[in-house]
């Protein structure tokens, strides 16, 4: 099991990071929160969770241990896989997710793509008591900003990687930026995730 990798950030998109360590480039699947935390950095330490399947070995990276712990809790719920857990963590920062689960807020969970009412209820029931110890640890991850010229392109690319259609993603991102042109890419994506 890999606890963390420390190295140079070679490539960073809202859903993926390439981290070079010891001459090896590790491809990491990341959430939007992790992207925000590493937005302007060239090196970093990222916590890892490894998923081994018959057809693939995947690495999921997290800026903070609490985000990884929430990921593990989410994937322990029946019907929630790694990509769905990443989608939830991209839509809700760790502190907000802990609050949502603690207050049994079904609406906030069903607003996430791929989460229906039954899955949301299952998450709330299964994790209600497990997140209580995390409430004191939960804090907002630092936010990073990206130049406005790349916001549309990056946001659309991230939404497409998360499984949304390109046309719908472009329409949502354009509408968001029309109303708030100074938003950072991660805020645009979070808003779009709630719209789509």
Curated annotation (Swiss-Prot):
Q: Which GO terms describe its biological process?
A: DNA recombination; DNA repair
Pfam short name (any one): RuvA_C
| Coiled-coil stretches | none
Keyword DNA damage part of the UniProt annotation = yes
For region Domain III, the annotated ranges are 147-196
The protein's GO terms of the molecular function aspect are: ATP binding; four-way junction DNA binding; four-way junction helicase activity
Q: Does the keyword Iron-sulfur apply?
A: no
Please list where the region (Flexible linker) is annotated. 142-146
Q: Which UniProt keywords apply?
A: Cytoplasm, DNA damage, DNA recombination, DNA repair, DNA-binding
Please give the residue ranges the record annotates as the region Domain I: 1-63
Entry's localization field: Cytoplasm
Q: Where is this region: Domain II?
A: 64-142
Give the UniProt entry's GO cellular component terms.
cytoplasm; Holliday junction helicase complex; Holliday junction resolvase complex
What is the documented function of this protein? The RuvA-RuvB-RuvC complex processes Holliday junction (HJ) DNA during genetic recombination and DNA repair, while the RuvA-RuvB complex plays an important role in the rescue of blocked DNA replication forks via replication fork reversal (RFR). RuvA specifically binds to HJ cruciform DNA, conferring on it an open structure. The RuvB hexamer acts as an ATP-dependent pump, pulling dsDNA into and through the RuvAB complex. HJ branch migration allows RuvC to scan DNA until it finds its consensus sequence, where it cleaves and resolves the cruciform DNA.
Return the similarity comment: Belongs to the RuvA family.
Q: How does it assemble?
A: Homotetramer. Forms an RuvA(8)-RuvB(12)-Holliday junction (HJ) complex. HJ DNA is sandwiched between 2 RuvA tetramers; dsDNA enters through RuvA and exits via RuvB. An RuvB hexamer assembles on each DNA strand where it exits the tetramer. Each RuvB hexamer is contacted by two RuvA subunits (via domain III) on 2 adjacent RuvB subunits; this complex drives branch migration. In the full resolvosome a probable DNA-RuvA(4)-RuvB(12)-RuvC(2) complex forms which resolves the HJ.
**Recorded domain comment:** Has three domains with a flexible linker between the domains II and III and assumes an 'L' shape. Domain III is highly mobile and contacts RuvB.
* UniProt protein name: Holliday junction branch migration complex subunit RuvA
Gene symbol here is ruvA
């Amino acid at each position: 099991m890999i606890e963390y990798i420390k190295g140079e950030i070679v490539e960073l998109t809202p859903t993926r990071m390439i981290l070079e360590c010891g001459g090896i480039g590790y491809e990491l699947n990341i959430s939007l929160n992790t992207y925000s935390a590493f937005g302007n950095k060239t090196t970093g330490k990222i916590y890892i969770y490894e998923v081994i399947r018959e057809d693939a070995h995947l690495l999921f990276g997290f800026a903070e241990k609490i985000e990884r712990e929430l990921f593990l809790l989410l994937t322990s719920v029946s019907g929630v896989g790694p990509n769905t857990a990443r989608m939830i963590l991209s839509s809700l920062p760790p502190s907000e997710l802990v609050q949502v689960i603690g207050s049994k807020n079904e609406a906030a969970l069903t607003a996430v793509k791929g989460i229906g009412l039954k899955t949301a209820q299952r998450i709330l029931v299964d994790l209600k008591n497990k997140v209580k110890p995390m409430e004191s640890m939960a804090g907002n991850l630092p936010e990073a900003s990206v130049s406005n010229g790349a916001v549309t392109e990056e946001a659309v690319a991230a939404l497409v990687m998360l499984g949304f259609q390109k046309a719908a993603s472009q329409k949502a991102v354009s509408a968001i930026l029309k109303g708030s042109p100074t938003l950072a890419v991660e805020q645009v994506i979070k808003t779009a995730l709630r719209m789509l």
